[in-house]
From Swiss-Prot:
It is an enzyme of class 3 (hydrolase). This is Ribonuclease P protein component. One of its GO terms (molecular function) is tRNA binding. RNaseP catalyzes the removal of the 5'-leader sequence from pre-tRNA to produce the mature 5'-terminus. It can also cleave other RNA substrates such as 4.5S RNA. The protein component plays an auxiliary but essential role in vivo by binding to the 5'-leader sequence and broadening the substrate specificity of the ribozyme. It catalyses: Endonucleolytic cleavage of RNA, removing 5'-extranucleotides from tRNA precursor. The gene is rnpA. The keyword Aminoacyl-tRNA synthetase does not apply. Its EC number is 3.1.26.5.
Amino acid sequence: MSRDFSREKRLLTPRHFKAVFDSPTGKVPGKNLLLLARNNDLDHPRLGLVIGKKSVKLSVERNRLKRLMRESFRQHQDSLVGWDIVIVARKGLGDVENPELIQHFGKLWKRLARSRPTPEEKSEPAGVDSTDA
């Protein structure tokens, strides 16, 4: 899988965001943010960002956060295959320094990847049932 952040790896329409908000299968709270995820049945993850003016006042800070989030996602997307992910920023996130944010996102991606049941666990019982039948 390529490590780019092309258009196909973004949540673009309100419908995509609504699907994740309405029925998240994974939820990882973090410091000053919330990470929501939903299975997407694709061979790549997709990312959506919600950073409002109420949470982070200055556009410079909002843009910095978006750059850091996208870059962290791009670097960790191999472990996030099959998720639609929405990151919701909360008050105070703009005050966190870059190195701390990068480290924090690394931990969040790992927690999200661990929360997904592995495909082997899903297919094993089906395989056992089909061989017995």
